């Protein structure tokens, strides 16, 4: 059985490393809450985690556009459906 490639397949190792770092950041947020640190310190760390996740998400979207849409490797083939799928993903990222 052939392995299916995704837009992130070539950088999967780096992606997993980044996600592991983000996981560590989240554990760090829990630790500073346990330590009763100043509220603004907690919020600052939460914002750092969100920024890191946003960066990962944007990288995944970039890979999706280049590999899946432009390269024609999966997803819808109709340009209108492609645009709708992409804009839906972007909308979910920015509407928190």
Where would I find each of the regions flagged by the language model?
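Solvent-exposed interaction patches of small proteins and small membrane subunits
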Residues: 1-96
């Amino acid at each position: 059985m052939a392995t299916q490639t995704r837009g992130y397949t070539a950088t999967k190792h780096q992606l997993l490393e980044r996600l592991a770092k983000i996981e560590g950041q989240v554990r760090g947020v829990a630790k500073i809450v346990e330590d009763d640190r100043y509220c603004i310190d907690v919020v600052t760390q939460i914002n750092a985690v969100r920024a890191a996740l946003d960066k990962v998400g944007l990288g995944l979207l970039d890979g999706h556009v280049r590999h899946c849409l432009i390269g024609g490797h999966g997803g819808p083939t109709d340009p209108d459906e492609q645009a709708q799928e992409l804009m839906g993903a972007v909308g979910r990222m920015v509407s928190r």
